[in-house]
Amino acid sequence: MTSVTDRSAHSAERSTEHTIDIHTTAGKLAELHKRREESLHPVGEDAVEKVHAKGKLTARERIYALLDEDSFVELDALAKHRSTNFNLGEKRPLGDGVVTGYGTIDGRDVCIFSQDATVFGGSLGEVYGEKIVKVQELAIKTGRPLIGINDGAGARIQEGVVSLGLYSRIFRNNILASGVIPQISLIMGAAAGGHVYSPALTDFVIMVDQTSQMFITGPDVIKTVTGEEVTMEELGGAHTHMAKSGTAHYAASGEQDAFDYVRELLSYLPPNNSTDAPRYQAAAPTGPIEENLTDEDLELDTLIPDSPNQPYDMHEVITRLLDDEFLEIQAGYAQNIVVGFGRIDGRPVGIVANQPTHFAGCLDINASEKAARFVRTCDCFNIPIVMLVDVPGFLPGTDQEYNGIIRRGAKLLYAYGEATVPKITVITRKAYGGAYCVMGSKDMGCDVNLAWPTAQIAVMGASGAVGFVYRQQLAEAAANGEDIDKLRLRLQQEYEDTLVNPYVAAERGYVDAVIPPSHTRGYIGTALRLLERKIAQLPPKKHGNVPL
């Protein structure tokens, strides 16, 4: 049934149409103006008010909030769907449910699309999909980052297989753009079905707490098929994808927080893989490193506890090495490893660091995959990698073994070995066994390896090694009735003094320098300047076979 308000609006529209003479130049301009005004609110002001009542912005307002003021240039604003099935021909709103175009963020060009959930629930139809494909291709062609603001509910069922075909074209473009231009997805509402795969193919996914959801099948379908009851937030909310699935890279407190994060993220990324990341002007230190030490540098000399089993927060190291802020990625997921962006002497760097406060810094499946993904992202976009190592090994347990720690842990090996960007490693404390190899070892292709005097580089820790190295001696002592615990402690100390230090590795060239912790920032800065002109080539190949 048509409301009185709707009838009045239609009458006014017909009246306006009657007053426009489209056979004159003035009339043609008036017609254009009318259509452009209509495209701003394709389904009316009531729909806009409902969006605002939920504390959310409209698709267009989100673009304005993210981009520089007055920089947005819209494309295909007058596009309409072509379907006539199920009476769709009677409702053909301009734009077809997605706003596309380009603009600037902090003066840098970006391409963008924003899905409009007020039009057919944000469902994807043929024209809707064509608009996204078009702006994707524009971003690839011009070498500009692509930002997708997602708020849609799957395929437009009334348009049939054509919707699925457009999904496939969008996915393929995501793949073609991968490693060529940065792709960032914001999830600003419920994204279901086919709508979730495109964000998953992009470089970064940002969600909003208590507002965003992502899932393949919703709660109703799950209950019907499995009998399991779950809410939308539990199934696919920001916390779920941040802490459990690892799909989200940041969980924002609100829409503006999400936009601020995107702006900061882009400040570390180049527009495409053929250029370098933005670099801020910073005066290079002159003179010896020890003459340029700050109070923050000196604090590193007392940061590592005397006991090798006492944890410390690796963030305390990271913040003292960087110029200013540390933009952490996936902070709530696999917290035994820390990854994110920062700057040293104005140069963007990617930080990969073990976190001793979680699982003692051990690598597990999730940490390996998180770090591997981040390393590949840095390598795609020419961002040097700095590894901070304090790793006692891979996390033991049947759960890890059964779920594929061998194959999935190898992803980090593969990512690091394949990366050709400058690679710098700092061993702060433990670097044991296979985890030593994985975390930026010299023979895995690291360019500059540094170690602190507190570094412990060995096949394994003293407590485990003594049982192997001194097995016969311990057995004989036990047979003679000696104090085994006292002997074991003495042998552990002997093992630590002999092998568990940075100097054996330094003697053999596996470590380039053993340095005071306070000198770390200075050494990294000089290494970054040296490696600016690094030339590295991989053997010709179609592509490698990552252990997926």
UniProtKB/Swiss-Prot annotation:
EC class (word): transferase
The entry's keywords: Lipid metabolism, Transferase
The protein's Enzyme Commission number: 2.1.3.15, 2.1.3.-
Positions of the CoA carboxyltransferase C-terminal domain: 295-541
Domain of life the protein comes from: Bacteria
Cellular compartments per GO CC: acetyl-CoA carboxylase complex; peptidoglycan-based cell wall; plasma membrane; protein-containing complex
Catalysed reaction, written as an equation: N(6)-carboxybiotinyl-L-lysyl-[protein] + acetyl-CoA = N(6)-biotinyl-L-lysyl-[protein] + malonyl-CoA; N(6)-carboxybiotinyl-L-lysyl-[protein] + propanoyl-CoA = methylmalonyl-CoA + N(6)-biotinyl-L-lysyl-[protein]
Transmembrane segments: none
Sequence ranges of Basic and acidic residues compositional bias: 7-21
Induction conditions: Expressed at higher levels during the exponential growth phase.
BP term (GO), one: lipid metabolic process
Protein name as it appears in the record: Biotin-dependent acetyl-/propionyl-coenzyme A carboxylase beta5 subunit
